[in-house]
Amino acid sequence: LLSMMAARAGAGRVVACEENPAIADSARRIVAANGYADRIRVVTGNSTELELESDLEGHADVIVSEIVSNNLLAEGVLTTLADAASRLLAPGGQMIPMGGAVMVALANWGAATRTHMAEVAGFDLDGFNALAQVPRNVAVSDATLTLHSTPAALLSFDFTGKAAREPHRGAATLVSDGTPVSGIVQWIRLDLDAEASYENRPGPDAKSHWGAQFYPFDAPLDLAAGTELRVVGVHDGHQLLVWREDRCPRSELPSS
């Protein structure tokens, strides 16, 4: 899809890279059906395996990608784009997006308890809730998910240079609006270029195939308006963990 958009916008030569052979084969047929077979070539494989001359016929003037996940990192975006920027992009070329950020805010998610274990057949199974997956995925359009602080960038990344050293930490100070909160919600921002950006910030009118991630507190916090709460995040290049500073997790990195 991105390749056909590039060709429609005027690109004279486009190389699309798709690792899954079945999807790549279907993509070739779709490209031909839309009349772009003369300008778009679909290469099967990972972009890190592309040969500069045989696959690309030289450095690319523009590299457009969409390989980010709900936490921005899970698809190996940092190492993949660092390789593309350093090896495949022409001097002065443009990476789209050129960067991204992990965004966070204090939040309430009313529907979070709907999947909690409670009483079954007269037995109290509440203890199983300690095994619930964290973070929990939530649709950004979920009407029961409400933000109660000014959003902040917890981790920011430059996709035009070398990948950040791992593990990488970041911190942000969130200011409460005075509403009791039950956790931290995380979403993503993509900086397409120096002027335009995309953000799947949660809200009732939000539309995105990317979801948000919710990190619940052990118990709701009743904070006065203006109260500052410091949030910490750490990643290993693929996984992300977020917590409030006074509640350090058992491990600073998620287990694989």
Task: Tell me the role of every PLM-derived stretch.
Residues L2-S256:
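Class I SAM-binding transferase module
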